Amino acid sequence: MTTAFYPGSFDPITNGHVDVLVQALNVAEKVIVAIGIHPGKAPLFSFDERAELIRLSLAQALPGKTGDITVVAFDNLVVDAARAHGATLLIRGLRDGTDLDYEMQMAGMNRAMAPDIQTIFLPAGTASRPITATLVRQIAAMGGDVSAFVPPAVLQALTSKRPN
């Protein structure tokens, strides 16, 4: 069984992330969505909230396939976390050339540290290319409509975080 490891902050999960996850299930039988925990950062959503939003979003997008996806936390090197979960593929989504430049550097370093783990780049669909979790958080915080960029569960969670 091929296991893929999809690391990110997912703060929050966006339609772009969901798009990449749908594609990832075409190249791996199992996908581990790995939420990075970084002590110096203050995410909008806690790990538990992010994990639940991922589960709810995927249940809607992939009915019947969520058993092939596991959500975990990690706070170490991506390749070490992937290896600990038995993954042989790293999944990375690409929106544009800027992402490609950065991700190629990361893939090279990961390959040097873990030649047994391959990085797979999955292109974002046209509709999800402009979406970033950072922009979603900023727009939502200012009362903007982010419904086109996030799954319904995330929209509801963002709305509940907005000050009245």
UniProtKB/Swiss-Prot annotation:
Biological processes, Gene Ontology terms: coenzyme A biosynthetic process
Gene name as annotated: coaD
One of the record's GO cellular component terms: cytoplasm
Cofactor(s) it depends on: Mg(2+)
Organism: Rhizobium etli (strain CIAT 652)
Annotated transmembrane regions: none
Name under which the protein is recorded: Phosphopantetheine adenylyltransferase
Main location group: cytoplasm
EC numbers for this chain: 2.7.7.3
